[in-house]
Amino acid sequence: MKRHLLFLGAPGAGKGTQAELLSQTNSYLHLSTGELLRKEIDMNTILGIQVKDIMNRGELVSDELVLKIVRQNLVKDNKGWILDGYPRNLSQANSLNEVLTEINQPLEVVFYLDIPEEVLIKRLLLRGRKDDTEKTIRTRVDIYKKTTEPLIQYFKDLSLLEYIDADRDLKTISSDIKQKMA
């Protein structure tokens, strides 16, 4: 069974949900970069202080700093890990591959949760978050297409990509993922 996994997909495709389910059933470490950054801030670590300062200025946390935090969590691995929503661009993917080679934990499979854009927008609007207006959702999807979609070809070229139809019920998607992990 594969133990080093990555979930890719547009905002609202179900990456976090599927990653969390899988991490619970397999005791894998679930690494979501947003949660990792918040944890560093909450723990008031040296990296957390840097991250908080950057975020307070309204700036984006650098790829280098995010990778440092991801790396320090990957080396804690004992059973397996799942990266959720990282990397977000080709530069991050190349840097991540270097780190994974260095720590001898190569990526084994990338699950791409594929979902039609209109279904995605409807799903996000139903979440009921204040910042989830149709306009902001479309903007986020456009940014995703420009920066993250090239990763699909990148991981396909590395023979790591598995397509998952994310326009189905939770159980069916989860079952499909488990089959492709074997």
Curated annotation (Swiss-Prot):
AMP binds at T33, R38, E59, L60, V61, G85, Y86, P87, R88, Q92, R129, R140. Residues 32-61 are annotated as: NMP. One of its GO terms (biological process) is AMP salvage. GO terms for cellular component: cytoplasm. It is found in: Cytoplasm. Disulfide bonds: none annotated. SUPFAM superfamilies: P-loop containing nucleoside triphosphate hydrolases. InterPro entries: Adenylat/UMP-CMP_kin, Adenylat_kinase_CS, P-loop_NTPase. Pathway: Purine metabolism; AMP biosynthesis via salvage pathway; AMP from ADP: step 1/1. Residues 126-132 are annotated as: LID. Keywords: ATP-binding, Cytoplasm, Kinase, Nucleotide biosynthesis, Nucleotide-binding, Transferase. Its EC number is 2.7.4.3. Pfam families: ADK. It catalyses: AMP + ATP = 2 ADP. GO terms for molecular function: adenylate kinase activity; ATP binding. CDD domains: ADK (cd01428). The keyword ATP-binding applies. Catalyzes the reversible transfer of the terminal phosphate group between ATP and AMP. Plays an important role in cellular energy homeostasis and in adenine nucleotide metabolism. HAMAP family: Adenylate_kinase_Adk. PANTHER family: NUCLEOTIDE KINASE (PTHR23359). Consists of three domains, a large central CORE domain and two small peripheral domains, NMPbind and LID, which undergo movements during catalysis. The LID domain closes over the site of phosphoryl transfer upon ATP binding. Assembling and dissambling the active center during each catalytic cycle provides an effective means to prevent ATP hydrolysis. NCBIfam families: PRK00279.1-3, PRK14527.1, PRK14531.1. Belongs to the adenylate kinase family. Monomer. This is Adenylate kinase.
